[in-house]
Each structure stands twice: as structure tokens, then as C-alpha cells.
């Protein structure tokens, strides 16, 4: 059963705060991306692969993956054993060099983080950071 938006955010707020303390990524960014990318837990990758952030397989990924259609048909998306693995991996993705400019932003500056993540190529939608 899908959660409403507020229940979804409430369920994952504490872990997002923990990720903020550990990595400096605003909890609001983690929650917003998680909700947006997973359709608040209803997307097929979220339900079947515990992939709540739409993270695709890259050259360094050695874990399991599943095929889903996104920008193109049958793209490889990372598969996780549980939602916590997905959240942790999302934080690690945002610590990679393509998003290193974001690490200069305060955890309270969610606007700069959102724009920086978009500029780093996280999503293809023109208004992703809005």
C-alpha cells in the first residue's frame, strides 16, 4: 500500500537526518529526491528493486541490477536488498566527483544542493531542481 506524502516523509525523516550528519547532504534533499524518484514508494524500481532514487548502473557498480525503461528502454538500474541500502548508496553517489561542488554547500542550503545535483547530471528533466 502506498503511503501519502506526509507519511512517506515521516517514515524516512530520521534516516535522512542521520545521512545529513554523516555526509552533509541536506535531509530535505534526500527526502525530496527519494519521494520524487520513487513516486513516494510506488515506482516499479522502488517496489521490486528497493531503488528509491532511480540510480542506474554505472561502470563501477558490481552489484545486482534490474532492467527498467526510463529515458530509454531497458536501462540497468541498481538493485538493493532493502531501502536502507538504497539510501546509503544515494549518499555515496552524491559524494562522487561529479557532485563534488555540492560538498561546498551548507547542509541548510538545499537550494544550492538541488541546483548542484541537477548541474551534475543527476536527472534529465529541465525543471528537476525546482
Protein language model regions, located:
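Catalytic cores of secreted/periplasmic lytic hydrolases that degrade extracellular macromolecules
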Residues: 1-130
Amino acid at each position: 500500500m502506498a503511503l501519502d506524502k506526509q507519511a512517506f516523509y515521516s517514515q524516512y525523516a530520521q534516516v535522512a537526518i542521520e545521512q545529513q550528519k554523516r555526509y552533509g547532504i541536506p535531509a530535505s534533499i534526500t527526502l525530496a529526491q527519494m519521494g520524487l524518484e520513487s513516486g513516494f514508494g510506488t515506482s516499479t524500481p522502488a517496489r521490486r528493486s528497493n531503488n528509491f532514487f532511480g540510480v542506474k548502473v554505472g561502470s563501477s557498480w558490481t552489484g545486482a541490477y534490474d532492467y527498467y525503461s526510463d529515458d530509454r528502454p531497458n536501462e540497468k538500474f541498481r538493485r538493493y536488498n532493502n531501502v536502507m541500502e538504497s539510501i546509503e548508496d544515494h549518499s555515496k553517489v552524491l559524494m562522487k566527483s561529479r557532485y563534488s561542488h555540492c560538498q561546498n554547500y551548507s547542509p541548510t542550503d538545499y537550494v544550492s544542493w538541488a541546483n548542484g545535483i541537477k548541474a551534475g547530471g543527476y536527472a534529465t528533466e529541465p525543471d528537476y531542481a525546482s
